[in-house]
């Protein structure tokens, strides 16, 4: 029996789950030897289900949504790659540290790469992207990608017309000087999908995010070109025959918005060939015992946090502001860490697809802390109570609730981002 393979990708705290299914149409072809083998098939259309509707910010420097990123990933390319060890490595962009100044790097972009409008991609496009991020009128979420460069802050504050730490050498080479010595300068630097200088140079920065070049006719240097956008419903893409890595095998990619609860049915019906799913859907598939569905797992660097708001945040400047006094007490933070049963939360919200972390870098990452490297806060109610007592957080009026050291009611407010799982709120209350 010939099988058509469909896949579901699931991103949890530390795993990616892939689902494959037998197709119902015997005329469809692919590799028949095994469910995860490679296929020599070319042409055709791949329909991908996405749960989050795109917001229309189809350039990476303006987007903050998964829906938009799902689209951008098909038509634009990052300038760097990440190896199996999760370390960055050259792709379109390569770099070399200056022998006499370790804050200075020389960057080169590959020659022969074209934008999807036929114009050549050069270092000018990347430099233009960086200058845009530092512009005072830029209000997107990516300023941090240029803040590490010398002179970016001065341009951001209107004290300079350009970033002093960027020097163009030729059309394919530029020199960048970082502001200070930091281990993650290269990681922080904006090397994701660039924008075209030719397309955007005559659009005021304050108007870019709402322009047709972002919302209706986006172009990139990736394997597919945007053909048609139906707001909130679908995006159609066609292959870029001039893609710098070679012509893609699949002719067309159709991205379709599908409710998470309908993903499994849509896959089994053949309405979609691939989809992004959440933990509850992964559990549903696993529990179904269907012979047509298979979940494959791999480490991921995705994580979810319960954090303390220690400072105000200046959204425009994208900087941390003054301290908030409420959680500055270390013993209070430690007590709350001991009081939270993280394993119970993972089982309740993510159905076991994950594990507790003891830092902001997941253990799957090459720089993540290994077991025993940092202090682990295991669930311990007695220890939490002891630390609260030591910090002066006691029930001083006998009402059964603790007050702060000044005798005022102590209230903890939890805020959660909007998600695709409607059961999060009632289950949080139950916990």
Q: What annotation goes with each model-predicted range?
A:
Residues 326-430:
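Append "and occasionally in soluble cytosolic enzymes with long acidic Gly/Pro-rich linkers
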Residues 49-100, 219:
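N-terminal lobe/hinge region of extracytoplasmic solute-binding protein
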Residues 94-142, 175, 266, 326-327:
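Aromatic- and charge-enriched surface segment that lines or borders ligand/interaction sites
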Residues 144-202:
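Surface-exposed binding/hinge segments that line
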Residues 18-21:
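C-terminal motif of bacterial Sec signal peptides marking the signal peptidase cleavage site
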Residues 189-248, 252, 381-382, 386:
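Gly/Pro-rich hinge or "lid" segments in bacterial periplasmic/extracellular proteins
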Residues 207-215, 240-287:
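Ligand-site clamp/hinge motif
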Residues 238-241, 303-331, 348:
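A bilobed periplasmic-binding-protein/Venus flytrap-type ligand-binding module shared by bacterial periplasmic
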